[in-house]
């Protein structure tokens, strides 16, 4: 279950530098707009200390982490919704991702040009948000034209959809994104099926200078971004893309020492994945055996058969039981045999809601 997050931002805010750092994919990064014309896609392993601990306990032949997919989408500029700055192509790429990571420039540097001539993170955020809203407004207006005809004929489904479309249109005309509209559960499902840009969850990535990362909380730009995000119920993480490039070249103890010297508790990659997980309501379960220990990503609230289906559709179709133990219980027991003897291993049925950190062996028959 690979996740996809689109990294967006105005030109020269540091998004391609960040992408290079976290994926080590080498996307071209230069001091001019549109150095990323085609989307660069990179798949990174999701760091998880629990997977390392499980590997130590089980000693499998192979360990497989879960992954996260990042797409570096070229710099959006004012007028993108009307095709400015290769806008239409970029917007279509955003439609394909699960979440949007918007990199916001929170550093001053005369050597790096800003597309609007000054550093103003809120203006940058609003510029991108408005372009996405305008693109969604156009889509909704077209949809209203088609659905409205059926609604006039008293088609119940069309009438229900039209109500949602009108709610969205009203929000867009007030320059509010779709994710701020309050829907019922049924309306929310229908709204999601419209594949609107502004219904996707957003994570703001405040990119600060190298000399500010250890005291980023006092950065005035960062404070403004956090205030803005709070009104949207959006998440914010603070990184320094240039430092992330350096961290990407280090491993193990060398990496830990470098982070300590900078006064940083975790790398930007770890922050980004943790925040994206929270944003998308995701969690991890594990399968563990002598052949392989593997991490699997699932959506919180999924039941055991659905999680089994992530491995293979046959597992879901022929689901019988899920032999389950929590990560903490397994570690405390020392191994699976001891966990079973201690009564920590449970047999769960079709209605069991899988929890983050569960270690599961699925029983199935097809």
Task: Identify the meaning behind each predicted range.
Residues 34, 48-51, 64-70, 84-97, ...:
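Amphipathic alpha-helical transducer elements in NTP-driven molecular machines
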Residues 6, 34, 39-42, 49-51, ...:
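Short capping/connector residues at structural and topological boundaries
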Residues 3-8, 13, 19, 146-353, ...:
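C-terminal-of-GTPase-core extension/linker across diverse P-loop GTPases
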Residues 25-33, 40-42, 50-53, 82, ...:
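Glycine-rich, flexible loop/turn motifs
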Residues 24, 56, 92, 96, ...:
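Short, intrinsically disordered, mixed-charge
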Residues 42-47, 74-84, 95-158, 171-184, ...:
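Conserved Switch II/interswitch segment of TRAFAC-class P-loop GTPases
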Residues 1-109, 141, 147:
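Conserved G1/Walker A P-loop phosphate-binding module
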């Amino acid at each position: 279950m690979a996740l996809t997050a689109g990294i967006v931002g105005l030109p020269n805010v540091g998004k391609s530098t960040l992408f290079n750092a976290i994926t080590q994919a080498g996307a071209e990064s230069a001091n001019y707009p549109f150095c990323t014309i085609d989307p660069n896609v990179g798949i990174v392993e999701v760091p998880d200390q629990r997977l390392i601990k499980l590997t130590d306990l089980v000693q499998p032949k192979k360990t497989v982490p879960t992954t996260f997919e990042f797409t570096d989408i070229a710099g959006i500029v004012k007028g993108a919704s009307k095709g400015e700055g290769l806008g239409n192509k970029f917007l279509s790429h955003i439609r394909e991702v699960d979440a949007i990571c918007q990199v916001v420039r929170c550093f001053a540097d005369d050597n790096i040009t800003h597309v609007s001539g000054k550093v103003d993170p809120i203006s940058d955020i609003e510029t991108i948000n408005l372009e996405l809203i305008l693109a969604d407004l156009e889509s909704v207006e077209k949809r209203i034209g088609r659905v409205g005809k059926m609604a006039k004929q008293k088609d119940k489904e069309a009438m229900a959809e039209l109500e949602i479309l009108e709610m969205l249109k009203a929000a867009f005309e007030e320059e509010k994104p779709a994710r701020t509209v309050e829907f019922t559960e049924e309306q929310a499902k229908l709204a999601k099926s419209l594949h609107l840009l502004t219904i996707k969850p957003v994570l703001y990535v405040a990119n600060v200078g190298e000399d500010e990362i250890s005291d980023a909380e006092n950065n005035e730009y960062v404070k403004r971004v956090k205030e803005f995000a709070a009104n949207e119920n959006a998440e914010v993480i603070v990184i320094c893309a240039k430092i992330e490039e350096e961290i990407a070249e280090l491993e193990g103890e060398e990496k830990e020492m470098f982070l300590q010297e900078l006064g940083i508790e975790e790398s930007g990659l770890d922050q980004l994945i943790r925040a994206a997980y929270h944003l998308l309501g995701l969690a991890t379960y594990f399968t563990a055996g002598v052949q392989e220990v593997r991490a699997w990503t699932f959506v919180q609230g999924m039941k055991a058969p659905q999680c089994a289906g992530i491995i293979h559709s046959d597992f879901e179709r022929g689901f019988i039981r899920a032999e389950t133990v929590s990560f903490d219980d397994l570690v405390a027991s020392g191994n699976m045999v001891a966990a079973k003897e201690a009564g920590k291993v449970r047999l769960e049925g079709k209605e069991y809601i899988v929890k983050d950190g569960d270690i599961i062996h699925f029983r199935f028959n097809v």
